[in-house]
């Protein structure tokens, strides 16, 4: 306890985190893209290479997953305005939200119904391509739908993939790996939902369950993979490949904005609110958004009050050297996808200059907003996907933040607030009814 007091003396906001108070932190260390980019260690060329790789796999995906055929084998989600929800939030919180609120529906992405369909599937495809190229079975000029042939399935069955997950990443990696022909093991933490485990098993995935939290599942997955030279471990805490899979979202979103005639420039700022677990998904997306929109996009991460790992790590500068358990927080939350006690050190250090802020919200707030969104817009999400929904109201309530940016009222009226809905499209009906019953 003495150490916690010392930490609070240096970093006063830690007291609010320990007290499980809903907290908003605006990052005093935020810089321009030009200043912050070198610290990421990845470039626009890396993201373009990821984009090209996904394009090579598009013919394969279109055939392997017919639900992607209409989009030509591209796994991408809709972006919709949510005016009724915006009004409801204003009414519930008594706070005007300047500008327009939009929802990015990664919750309804093809194949696995969450943001993890971006990074998880991309990393599995990257590994498959590498193995096939090295074996001389494929060239980058080939039509990749050839990978559906029995010969390729047999080739990939000699290799295995392992991952540790709270649920959604395991779902995307498990389904994709099994489809390609890999043997795959998903190490699931205690908070993983039963339906996600059942779905994986139906796809022929080996699911190993733990009574412990996310960190233990990842560690055990890593250890198991080390014992087998043909096993590839997908490291959610440190993977640059996963990160790049998420980053591709930036250019695609820019194209969606153009299609819808929406402007993002110095007088039309874009604020984006991303739920954060270990950090790979929101970190990668935020990186891609910064490359696409430059200094006109402002990214915020949202975490449960019981799992504020990235806020704790970035705010103190301790990153992965501190966990929420170190300050007496239990890491137990209904937002299973965000139940992470120790943030990715890679993402925290890469992105700490490119984040405008982080905030926390409690489980009940997520349940309330889950219910309101279903009532007002007819859109059903899982609890973690609502974490971003509290963002616009937090930003609009904080006078000092727009002042610091030099944003007057006219600029705020032109703002777009994009809430990134991370999952929920595949939640079974009975489970969704239970979620809806918990909202007020």
UniProtKB/Swiss-Prot annotation:
It is an enzyme of class 4 (lyase). It comes from Salmonella arizonae (strain ATCC BAA-731 / CDC346-86 / RSK2980). One of its GO terms (molecular function) is hydro-lyase activity. Monomer. This is D-serine dehydratase. Its EC number is 4.3.1.18. GO terms for biological process: D-serine catabolic process; isoleucine biosynthetic process. SUPFAM superfamilies: Tryptophan synthase beta subunit-like PLP-dependent enzymes (SSF53686). Keywords: Lyase, Pyridoxal phosphate. It catalyses: D-serine = pyruvate + NH4(+).
